[in-house]
């Protein structure tokens, strides 16, 4: 099992964070995969989550001899469709709840696209509070867990750097991600791909769940829509995801 920090993340320098692009993230992952192959002499199973899954699909397309399979958890596939789905979800939830505070937050967020950190984080807060990121956890609970984990890993000063870098990367990547569309130029993989989606994930349309596995070329493919799970399916239903990883 190998973990790594993407370029600009964690305690990296500001220069590293400012150099991030989607293409650079793909190239970095390809370099890591080659390094793992050279070090271990084995092919690897790539486990990617959200945008990380999208990056994995792009990287593995070009490294077929290094990778055994890909597990893609809630991959970002089409930003325009996803943003429209989320906006519609917010409108529906606001009308159903008849909650002035929720309505105010939705109105303040406005229509997509969300190309700055404040809007992106505001949307993330709403998604979490409405139960579509992790079941049973609101934004504050997820934020607390994340901060505690960062402090354990980086210490206080390191966490401050990591949070700074998070904002820098968002500012750099968000405008670029508006045009993200895997359907327009789908990856062509030579290894099996296993897609996992959460049934309560407002970011992923049902049409994307159906279309993505059919669009991306691969010698074998599975796709599962997991009940009682949001965007972070691996946290909500770890046993299901573990069983997929074991057999991948």
Residue ranges and their predicted role:
Residues 189, 195-197, 201:
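Short beta-strand/loop motif that positions the catalytic acidic residue
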Residues 97-184, 191:
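Alpha/beta-hydrolase
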Residues 1-13:
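Conserved alpha/beta-hydrolase
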Residues 67-112:
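A catalytic-pocket lid/entrance helix-loop region that shapes and gates access to the active site
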Residues 229-238, 242:
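Catalytic histidine-centered segment of alpha/beta-hydrolase-like enzymes
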Residues 202-208:
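Conserved alpha/beta-hydrolase "acid-adjacent" motif
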Residues 42-81:
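Conserved hydrolase catalytic core segment
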Residues 24-44:
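Conserved acidic catalytic loop of the alpha/beta-hydrolase fold
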């Amino acid at each position: 099992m190998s973990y790594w920090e993407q370029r600009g993340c964690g305690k990296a320098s500001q220069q590293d964070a400012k150099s991030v692009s989607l293409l650079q993230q793909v190239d970095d992952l390809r370099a890591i995969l080659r390094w793992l192959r050279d070090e271990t002499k084995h092919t690897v199973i790539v486990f990617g989550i959200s945008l990380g899954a999208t990056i994995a699909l792009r990287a593995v397309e070009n490294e077929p001899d290094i990778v055994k399979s890909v597990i893609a958890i809630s991959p970002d596939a089409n930003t325009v469709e996803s943003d429209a789905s989320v906006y519609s979800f917010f409108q529906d939830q606001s009308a159903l709840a008849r909650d002035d505070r929720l309505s105010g937050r939705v109105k303040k967020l406005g229509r997509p696209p969300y190309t700055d950190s404040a809007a992106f984080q505001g949307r993330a807060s709403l998604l979490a509070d409405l139960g579509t990121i992790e079941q049973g956890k609101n934004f504050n609970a997820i934020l607390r867990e994340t901060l505690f984990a960062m402090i354990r890993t980086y210490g206080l000063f390191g966490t401050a750097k990591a949070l700074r870098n998070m904002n820098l990367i968002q500012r750099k990547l968000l405008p670029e991600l508006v045009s993200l569309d895997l359907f327009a130029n789908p990856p062509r993989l030579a290894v099996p791909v296993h897609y996992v989606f959460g049934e309560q994930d407002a970011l992923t349309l049902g049409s994307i769940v159906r279309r993505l596995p059919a669009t991306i070329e691969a010698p074998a493919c599975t796709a599962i829509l997991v009940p009682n799970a949001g965007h972070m399916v691996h946290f909500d239903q770890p046993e299901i995801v573990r069983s997929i990883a074991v057999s991948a």
